[in-house]
Amino acid sequence: TTLVEKSNVQQKVFDNTFAVFEELKEALHEMTSEINDALEEQIDKRIRIEYRDRGKFEAQLQVAGDVLIFSMHTNVFEFNREHIIWQNSYVRDEKLNSYCGIINIYNFLSDSLKYNRNAEEGYLVGRIFINREMQYFVEGKRQMSMRHNNFGQGVIDKSALIDIVEHAINYALEFDLLVPPYEI
C-alpha cells in the first residue's frame, strides 16, 4: 500500500462517514416528528422526543430522561490485529477495506447534562463503522442488525440507520438506574 493510496482511502472513508452522519441527522429529525405525532395524545408533553443538531459532528436525541448523543469521530481508524473483524474474508482479502470511520452512540441521563453533573458518566451503547465502499457494521448493546460477520454484505442506507437508532432508543429506555450499594 502506497502513501498516496492509503491517503486516498482514508479521505474517502472520512467523506463517506460524513455523508452517512448527515443522513443520520436527517433520519433523527424525521423520526422525532413521526414519533411525537404518533404519541401526541398518549404521553405527557414533558417527555416528548427532542432532536438537537449540535454542529457538524454531533447530534442529540432526548428520549424521556435519556439523551442519546451521536458523535462522528473526525479520524479514520484501522482495527488492531486481535479484533474479530480480521476473521471476515472481506477484510482479510483486501486490507484497505479495514479502514473505517466511526459514529459513536452514547447514552446520558438528561439531568446529568441539564444540571452539569460532569462526574456522572454516559455509556457507549453503539458504534457504527463505515468504510470506503459504504459497507458497514455495528458494535453495540443489542445491535443485532449488521454484525461484524456481515461486514462487506450491505451498504449503509437510511433504513439501516433507522434500525440502528431504534435499537439504541430501546436500549436506553430499558436501561434502568440501579441504586449504588451503601457502604457503612
Task: Give the role of each language-model region.
Residues T1-K6, F70, I103, I128, ...:
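Generic hydrophobic, helix-prone segments enriched in Leu/Val/Ile
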Residues T2-I49:
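Contiguous, amphipathic alpha-helical segments that mediate oligomerization or scaffolding
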Residues S33-D44, F70-M72, F79-R81, L177-P181:
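Short, solvent-exposed secondary-structure capping/transition elements
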Residues Y123-I184:
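Glycine-rich, aromatic-bearing surface loops/beta-hairpins
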Residues K45-M146:
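Hydrophobic-cavity lipid-handling domains and compact docking modules
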